[in-house]
Amino acid sequence: MRLRNNKNAKLELESCENVIKNFPFKVEKNSTLEIGMGKGQMLIELAQKNPQKIFVGIEKYPTVALIAAKKAKKLELNNFFIIVDDVENALDFFEGTFDLIWLTFSDPWPKKRHYKRRLTYEKFLKIYSKILSENGLIKLKTDNDDFFQWTLESLEKNGLNIINKTSDLEKSEFAKDNVKTSYEQKFVSLGKNINFVEFSFKK
């Protein structure tokens, strides 16, 4: 079911303590970033399991971001933060900050003329290279098989190091450590395979 737009979401987010409103905002090293956080299910669970680390989620839709913000407040998480913006506008202040970036079920932009909007296009890869720490990693999950294959080709073309990959995460050796998004849970329950790749800029 499609989420109904909350016209007051932006205003409500202004009063949420875990929403980053002013930049630059200092984030400690050894932090994790999720781009396209959605309702925050995966990132909030990771924050609960790893209270010694900082977790930041980017979500451009206020209605969805507010759900995550309220959930984090209820759980009294002090290591979880939200940026409500588009990825291209939000990352200028985080050079060398993140040890791990998650790209979770981002828009595959299936039309060929939109390929430059895909979050594994070279323009975005350059952004990630700047905000990752020296030994930082990127992990991607997607249910879109065509986007996954295109991503693998983009990574190879741009000289990145593919560390691990699978076209069926649920049946792979990586499943035991996988924390699911709400979107992911839905598609796994329907029998849809989930593609996964882990990569870095360091050879």
From Swiss-Prot:
CDD domains according to UniProt: AdoMet_MTases
Residues that bind substrate, according to the entry?
A: K111, D143, T181, S182, Y183, E184
Transmembrane regions:
none
Return the EC number.
2.1.1.33
- What gene is this protein a product of? trmB
Reactions catalysed, as given in the entry: guanosine(46) in tRNA + S-adenosyl-L-methionine = N(7)-methylguanosine(46) in tRNA + S-adenosyl-L-homocysteine
Organism whose genome encodes this protein: Mycoplasmopsis pulmonis (strain UAB CTIP) (Mycoplasma pulmonis)
Q: Which NCBIfam families match?
A: PRK00121.2-2, tRNA (guanosine(46)-N7)-methyltransferase TrmB
Q: What is this protein called?
A: tRNA (guanine-N(7)-)-methyltransferase
Residues binding S-adenosyl-L-methionine are: E34, E59, D86, D107
Per the record, the domain of life is Bacteria
